[in-house]
Amino acid sequence: MLAVRNNILLLLFCLVVLLVFAQSSFLPPCEPVNETVAVEKEGCPKCLVFQTTICSGHCLTKEPVYKSPFSTVYQHVCTYRDVRYETVRLPDCPPGVDPHITYPVALSCDCSLCTMDTSDCTIESLQPDYCMSQREDFPVY
């Protein structure tokens, strides 16, 4: 009876390892990727659209079958590990409005808890190149 139980446990372990390997081999890893983003500022009539590097990809997460009101589930997301900050100037801002926007550029990424300081932690966010005002594409040299 003990041998049967051990064989079942071994089989379950092998299935879990196989599923993790299969899942991670078909989904893109968490890494820096080039993306078109838009930045805008209240008071400036145009948003600026340009290419930068963001973090994107798959992180292994666990969702418990039994959800207890006494325990908290922490999901890991693909987010910034190391960043560099760059500044762009928005076009046509009126006098008295600072036309500069500073944004993070991903140098490396990591699967960790979502930090609202550097990431959009919402379930369904707007696309990164969404503009509420008139678009102006930043020239690519």
Swiss-Prot record:
Residues 1-24 form the signal peptide. Residues 140-141 form a propeptide. GO terms for cellular component: cytoplasm; extracellular space. Belongs to the glycoprotein hormones subunit beta family. Keywords: Disulfide bond, Glycoprotein, Hormone, Secreted, Signal. Heterodimer of an alpha and a beta chain. Disulfide bonds join 30-78, 44-93, 47-131, 55-109, 59-111, 114-121. It comes from the Eukaryota. It is found in: Secreted. Glycans are attached at residue 34. This is Gonadotropin subunit beta-2. SMART domains: GHB. Gene3D superfamilies: Cystine-knot cytokines. GO terms for molecular function: hormone activity. The keyword Membrane does not apply. Involved in gametogenesis and steroidogenesis. GO terms for biological process: G protein-coupled receptor signaling pathway.
